[in-house]
UniProtKB/Swiss-Prot annotation:
Residue numbers spanned by region Disordered: 840-863
Residues spanning the signal sequence: 1-23
Record-given protein name: Matrilin-2
Keyword check for Glycoprotein: yes
Species for this entry: Homo sapiens
InterPro entries, sorted: cEGF (IPR026823), ECM_Assembly_Org (IPR050525), EGF-like_Ca-bd_dom (IPR001881), EGF-like_dom (IPR000742), EGF-type_Asp/Asn_hydroxyl_site (IPR000152), Growth_fac_rcpt_cys_sf (IPR009030), Matrilin_cc_sf (IPR036337), Matrilin_coiled-coil_trimer (IPR019466)
Carbohydrate-modified residues: N221
Gene Ontology biological-process entries: axon guidance; dendrite regeneration; extracellular matrix organization; glial cell migration; neuron migration; response to axon injury
Length: 956
């Protein structure tokens, strides 16, 4: 009876009183409810305006437990539909999700599911009653972890979009709600808690946000829930201050009607400034009395123990854990306490099973460390090793060796004895056969056994025979008959007059009155020693068109180049000079080569920093280069004609296409060098649609357009494209690439300017070897159509092909280097040539359309200068008996380095006189030796190629 009275009292109280702050709203709602018989939804008359452009993430959590009957469940759905009427629903305004819960949580739709209000209304009306338990805490946890995740459509916290939960429940939860609700509120979620009927009001307050009078509501039954519609319209449509003001909250900003409050994350407390947060350390603040460890938990603390200890009943002290004392350890043999746990051990002769509890007798052979090579046999307390048939056990009692019947029986095999499983047999080497006695061997004579058909020689091989020809003959295609070798016809003999076949090669011959020079190809008149009064004291030696005097052994030539004196001290003793020994009367001094200086011991040499030790005269950058130096210019500049000053490349227009060899002979490492070479050329140009336009082709067995003339308007983007260029690494179809360049690259469709604009057109073709197709046709067409062709060859590039590609004059358009180490020098020369062409094109008004104007007149290129050193002038005790060919500019640079550029304005003739100085002759000899070394290396390469060609011809 008392329970019935209490129930009636609570029902009446719930019908009369909600919360003080909402009394007027509920009173207004009740008056509306009394008029419900006149209209289906009279509360909609209160919706004077919707929450237009209001941004919010709203999730309804609906109690769908068995205590809610079908009629009440329908009332809840009507209430939700009424709330939806004043919301501005859409992806950029209010997003709506809905969960209903009983014993489990069902996600009806998430925040990202629907984009229109009509879709949400249909989904609400289709909901089915779960009719199970009341797991309110589980539903709030689901909303916190999943419903408000960005994956489900919630907007990031940094956007300050309000997150709102509206939860409707009619009974006491079957799980804990206070802790999970507090956690949700701490993350910034605003919770409205609506209780219907006999709901514990304290439970509602533990769910809803503060102040409770604005966020916690209690109605008597589900028929009265719709009276709250206008209340929520006012609360949901109020401006969210967190998104409109600079709130300065350190962790979370929580919207409250007309204002906001700051909240901290779990484990933090709000400072007195009501915006910043600090960690809440209750272990430090209170006398916790924990014996070992104190651990902070949200709003409190707990005591914990170290590993191997357990917390006593008082929750403060710690006692050691005896894990083995418990009867459920399960160890079959022995239990041993360990740190924080226990472990099982087995008696001797047993091993612990994988379950770590039971034991099994040890199978010694089953363990992987018994060491038996063939077979392991268990014994009572150990094991023993056995060998397979045909093997015997070694002294280590584990490994086995094969029984060597050949060694035991001494069978007398002439070549090889082969062991079998239980015996042996004799075997002969390849090309031999076993005699009937089964022991000795005889060579197989294939030439005698069959009609070999060789015209000249038959040669036995291991398995057969081959025909060979006598010296001076080549084997024919039938591999049997022979033809005499015409060496003069097979090779580019290079003889000046006539070529004569020899037994193994050819020889050049000269007409009467001439003799063959040392190159073995060109001819010279009879030696000067026989024709004139040479005046040599000891002996005269002809040297091509001249002669040199030589001295007998033990003597050296004097400075006059004719008379002799005894050998110098440098040759007579072990002088110890690292570089050069120079005679000085009856003694000697040590000197160093150019680029080095003498060490303190007077014998060893140390390398100079040429750029620091000389007045190099470089306007921008000096770079050490072996025993000398070279000048370089900063980006956007090119080296002037004097090799020292720098000048800015003109900004004139040009259409330039690179044709780059990407064949496998180049290699990936050298391909990177070529990319740097291209980047250096680009740096010297002004890249823009009105100035320089640049395209790039890479070719191998196919041609790939890396970028066209129209692709890039800046050097930065262009260089980035060059850096990302992938190496093709196949064949070398240079002719195909030239065809592609001629037919496509200079078309207006790919960015070339019309011929009528008279913009110069140029192509830089880079290759490192012989092309697999013809290059002349398309190179000729390109040049005939006004495209200036620059040819750059490295390594095995063929000079004839480079000449076919390059425009005239070739000394300005053809560049060759033996390896990639000199690519910088080629780059500087090429940039200089292109810049000169641009300067020239700027100054010419009537040049033919599409033709790159010829460069302005420059100082004539250095001609090869032949220097015959017949006497030593002022250089004592030094003799040069060879003739070398060098370019004049190399010699000039050498003397300029030696003189430290003290006379930069001097004429070349004045500088030539300095070549006769002793140190310059030493430099000259060093340069000559280097050139001879390079020529020798190239000669060796040509010899190897000739030998390969002869081998192919021999077996063709």
């Amino acid at each position: 009876m008392e329970k019935m009275l209490a129930g009636c009292f609570l029902l009446i109280l719930g019908q009369i009183v909600l919360l003080p702050a909402e009394a007027r709203e509920r009173s207004r709602g009740r008056s509306i409810s009394r008029g419900r018989h006149a209209r289906t939804h009279p509360q909609t008359a209160l919706l004077e305006s919707s929450c237009e452009n209001k941004r919010a993430d709203l999730v309804f959590i609906i109690d769908s437990s068995r205590s809610v009957n079908t009629h009440d469940y329908a009332k809840v759905k009507e209430f939700i539909v009424d709330i939806l009427q004043f919301l501005d629903i859409g992806p950029d305004v209010t997003r709506v999700g809905l969960l209903q819960y009983g014993s489990t949580v069902k996600n009806e739709f998430s925040l990202k599911t629907f984009k229109r209000k009509s879709e949400v209304e249909r989904a609400v009306k289709r909901m089915r009653h779960l009719s199970t338990g009341t797991m309110t805490g589980l539903a709030i946890q689901y909303a916190l972890n999943i419903a408000f995740s960005e994956a489900e459509g919630a907007r990031p916290l940094r956007e300050n979009v309000p997150r709102v939960i509206m939860i409707v429940t009619d009974g006491r939860p079957q799980d804990s709600v206070a802790e999970v609700a507090a956690k949700a509120r701490d993350t910034g979620i605003l919770i409205f808690a609506i209780g219907v009927g006999q709901v514990d009001f304290n439970t509602l307050k533990s769910i809803g946000s503060e102040p409770h009078e604005d966020h916690v509501f209690l109605v008597a039954n589900f028929s009265q829930i719709e009276t709250l519609t206008s209340v929520f319209q006012k609360k949901l449509c109020t401006a969210h201050m967190c998104s409109t003001l600079e709130h300065n909250c350190a962790h979370f900003c929580i919207n409250i009607p007309g204002s906001y409050v700051c909240r901290c994350k779990q484990g933090y407390i709000l400072n007195s400034d009501q915006t910043t947060c600090r960690i809440q350390d209750l272990c430090a603040m209170e006398d916790h009395n924990c014996e070992q460890l104190c651990v902070n938990v949200p709003g409190s603390f707990v005591c914990q123990c170290y590993s191997g200890y357990a917390l006593a009943e008082d929750g403060k002290r710690c006692v050691a854990v005896d894990y083995c004392a418990s009867e459920n350890h399960g160890c079959e043999h022995e239990c041993v306490n360990a740190d924080g746990s226990y472990l099982c051990q087995c008696h001797e002769g047993f091993a612990l099973n994988p379950d770590k509890k039971t034991c099994t007798k040890i199978d010694y052979c089953a363990s992987s460390n018994h060491g038996c090579q063939h077979e392991c046999v268990n014994t009572d307390d150990s094991y023993s090793c056995h060998c397979l048939k045909g093997f015997t056990l070694n002294p280590d009692k584990k490994t086995c060796r094969r029984i060597n019947y050949c060694a035991l029986n001494k069978p007398g095999c002439e070549h090889e004895c082969v062991n079998m499983e239980e015996s042996y047999y004799c075997r002969c080497h390849r090309g031999y056969t076993l005699d009937p006695n089964g022991k000795t061997c005889s060579r197989v004579d294939h030439c005698a056994q069959q009609d070999h058909g060789c015209e000249q020689l038959c040669l036995n091989t291991e398995d057969s025979f081959v025909c060979q020809c006598s010296e001076g003959f080549l084997i024919n295609e039938d591999l049997k008959t022979c033809s005499r070798v015409d060496y003069c016809l097979l090779s580019d003999h290079g003889c000046e007059y006539s070529c004569v076949n020899m037994d193994r090669s050819f020889a050049c011959q000269c007409p009467e009155g001439h003799v063959l020079r040392s190159d073995g190809k060109t001819c010279a008149k009879l030696d000067s020693c026989a024709l004139g009064d040479h005046g040599c004291e000891h002996s005269c030696v002809s040297s091509e068109d001249s002669f040199v005097c030589q001295c007998f052994e033990g003597y050296i030539l004097r400075e006059d180049g004719k008379t002799c004196r005894r050998k110098d001290v440098c040759q007579a003793i072990d002088h110890g000079c690292e570089h050069i020994c120079v005679n000085s009367d009856d003694s000697y001094t040590c000197e160093c080569l150019e680029g080095f200086r003498l060490a303190e011991d007077g014998k060893r040499c140390r390398r100079k920093d040429v750029c620091k030790s000389t007045h190099h005269g470089c306007e921008h950058i000096c770079v050490n280069n072996g025993n000398s130096y070279i000048c370089k210019c900063s980006e956007g500049f090119v080296l002037a004609e004097d090799g020292r000053r720098c000048k800015k490349c003109t900004e004139g227009p040009i259409d330039l296409v690179f044709v780059i060899d990407g064949s496998k002979s180049l290699g990936e490492e050298n391909f990177e060098v070529v990319k740097q070479f291209v980047t250096g050329i680009i740096d010297s140009l002004t890249i823009s649609p009105k100035a320089a336009r640049v395209g790039l082709l890479q070719y191998s067995t196919q041609v790939h357009t890396e970028f066209t003339l129209r692709n890039f308007n800046s050097a930065k983007d262009m260089k980035k494209a060059v850096a990302h260029m992938k190496y093709m690494g196949k064949g070398s179809m240079t002719g195909l690439a030239l065809k592609h360049m001629f037919e496509r690259s200079f078309t207006q469709g790919e960015g070339a300017r019309p011929l009528s604009t008279r913009v110069p057109r140029a192509a830089i073709v880079f290759t490192d070897g012989r092309a697999q197709d013809d290059v002349s046709e398309w190179a000729s067409k390109a040049k005939a159509n006004g495209i200036t062709m620059y040819a750059v060859g490295v390594g095995k590039a063929i000079e004839e092909e480079l000449q076919e590609i390059a425009s005239e004059p070739t000394n300005k358009h053809l560049f060759y280097a033996e390896d990639f180490s000199t690519m910088d020098e080629i780059s500087e020369k090429l940039k200089k040539g292109i810049c000169e062409a641009l300067e020239d094109s700027d100054g010419r008004q009537d040049s033919p359309a599409g033709e790159l104007p010829k460069t302005v007149q420059q100082p004539t290129e250095s001609e090869p200068v032949t220097i015959n050193i017949q006497d030593l002038l002022s250089c004592s005790n030094f003799a040069v008996q060879h003739r070398y060919l060098f370019e004049e500019d190399n010699l000039l640079r050498s003397t300029q380095k030696l003189s430290h550029s003290t006379k930069p304005s001097g004429s070349p003739l004045e500088e030539k006189h300095d070549q006769c100085k002793c140190e310059n002759l030493i430099m000259f000899q060093n340069l000559a030796n280097e050139e001879v070394r390079k020529l020798t290396q190239r000669l060796e390469e040509m010899t190897q190629r000739m030998e390969a060609l002869e081998n192919r011809l021999r077996y063709r």
